[in-house]
Curated annotation (Swiss-Prot):
InterPro entries: Rhabdo_ncapsid, Rhabdovirus_ncapsid_C, Rhabdovirus_ncapsid_N, Rhabdovirus_nucleoprotein-like. GO terms for cellular component: helical viral capsid; host cell cytoplasm; ribonucleoprotein complex; viral nucleocapsid. Belongs to the lyssavirus nucleocapsid protein family. It comes from West Caucasian bat virus. Coiled coil: none annotated. This is Nucleoprotein.
Length: 450
């Protein structure tokens, strides 16, 4: 009999079958480009820029914008922002430009056009007979791109924050080298009619293209990034959090991973560091893989690496970081166990690189300081009030070594010490906890009642 079959009895009948489950139709897709073809989209017929400008500006003022027309205009306006490539620009084997080449955002992607005409209307702008200047085009492009950033601001109690951001954006695009083309508060009013535009693939694609261009090319209108910067490492929260974590504890990726004492980290680490993905290559297509449509289900999101994400932010909470306290817990990824490991790692690395003497009069003074610090560590290891003298062999020569931390956890039977719980209570009780955040989790799990 096939080893994949099972046999059982139902109402005096012997049943033999092969258990099968639904295959995952939404597997993680890695962004690496293997066919050496630039990311591409298809838009309608390219418009006359002057007509398109007047039509889009009229629609902007009336808070009635057609997304297809906006995308067509944004693509047509790309040649206005020509710049010089500072170095050879190559990503995934694709030669984007050579050093000294004149390029504009359209050189980064392939934009194909059909013969479908846009719904262009000159109403509200027909009385303007002159052609708009480059500065006017830049202002309109900038305001349109800002619609993307505003649509990415979601959550409770964000109305005032969003309004303030929109006002600041308007100020940028009415100050030289830009020119004022709309009245105050128009951007926020129009955004309310376009609140979900970040979900429109073509619009997201063009916003990401502009951001990739201006992040590399020094340009008069580089401030256009104020509306596009959110496309960089979009849907990449897990990997971005891990990078910030390394800076916080001042370790290399390899050394940090040695502290990840949980079996569920294995698959996530393999997923996050798959070879040939250009995760560490500056100005790569990887940085904008989500907006450019290179990955439908990101392997680098917080949900894709939930155990890593939870651990990083529990360590951040222990260190009192507001960003971590406000982050959303991935409830399906062992938050209780991650909070225990986070407490031990937080204790080991808390304050490292914060209050330390770093500068000295000469090399001799530096050497004396290092020797004094080593002596302090030896004394602490000899009697740190937490380890029995007979257990010192578990700790080796370094209190922060992975072996030392691991053995402390095992000797405490995988439970937090009182000082860990006290610290968690302290940082969470002084913070206004939002629903489903790490602050709320710590308040509930490690409260006095529990």
């Amino acid at each position: 009999m096939d080893s994949e079959h099972i046999v059982f009895r139902v109402r005096n009948e012997i049943v033999t079958l092969k258990p099968e489950v639904i295959s995952d139709q939404y597997e993680y897709k890695y962004p690496a480009i293997t066919d050496k073809k630039k990311p591409s989209i298809t838009l309608g017929r390219a418009p006359d820029l002057s007509i398109a400008y007047r039509s889009i500006l009229s629609g902007f003022n009336a808070a009635k914008l057609d997304p297809d027309d906006v995308c067509s205009y944004l693509a047509a306006a790309m040649p206005l922002f020509e710049g010089v490539c500072p170095e050879d620009w190559i990503s995934y084997g694709i030669i984007i430009a050579r050093k000294g080449d004149k390029i504009n955002p359209s050189h980064l992607v392939d934009i194909m056009r059909t013969e479908v005409e846009g719904n262009w209307s000159q109403s509200g702008g027909a009385d303007v007979t002159r052609n708009p200047t480059v500065a006017e085009h830049a202002s309109l492009v900038g305001l349109l791109l800002c619609l993307y950033r505003l649509s990415k601001i979601v959550g409770q109690n964000t109305a005032n924050y969003k309004t303030n951001v929109a006002d600041r954006m308007e100020q940028i695009f009415e100050t030289a080298p830009f020119v004022k083309i709309i009245e105050h508060h128009t951007l926020m009013t129009t955004h309310k009619m376009c609140a979900n535009w970040s979900t429109i693939p073509n619009f997201r694609f063009l916003v990401g293209t502009y951001d990739m261009f201006f992040s590399r090319i020094d340009h008069l209108y580089s401030a256009l990034r104020v509306g596009t910067v959110v496309t960089a490492y979009e849907d990449c929260t897990g990997l971005v959090s891990f990078t910030a974590f390394l800076k916080q504890i001042n370790l290399s990726a390899r050394d940090a991973i040695l502290y990840f004492f949980h079996k569920n980290f294995e698959e996530e680490i393999r997923r996050m560091f798959r070879p040939n993905q250009e995760t560490a290559v500056p100005h790569s297509y990887f940085i904008h893989f989500r907006s450019l449509g290179l990955s439908g289900k990101s392997p680098y999101s917080s949900n894709a690496v939930g155990h890593v994400f939870n651990l990083i932010h529990f360590v951040g909470c222990y260190m009192g970081q507001v960003r971590s306290l406000n982050a959303t817990v991935i409830q399906t990824c062992a938050p209780h166990e991650m909070s225990v490991l986070g407490g031990y790692l937080g204790e080991e690395f808390f304050g490292k690189g914060t209050f330390e003497r770093r500068f000295f009069r000469d090399e001799r003074e530096l050497q004396d300081h290092l020797e004094a610090e080593e002596a302090k560590i030896d004394i602490a290891l000899a009697d740190d009030a937490t380890v029995d003298s007979g257990d010192e062999d578990f700790y080796g020569g370094e209190s922060r070594s992975p072996e030392a931390v691991y053995n402390r956890i095992i000797m405490n039977k995988g439970r937090l010490k009182k000082l860990h719980i006290k610290r968690y209570r302290s940082v969470s009780s002084n913070h206004q906890a939002r629903p489903n955040t790490f602050a709320e989790f710590l308040n509930k799990v490690y409260s006095d009642d529990n």
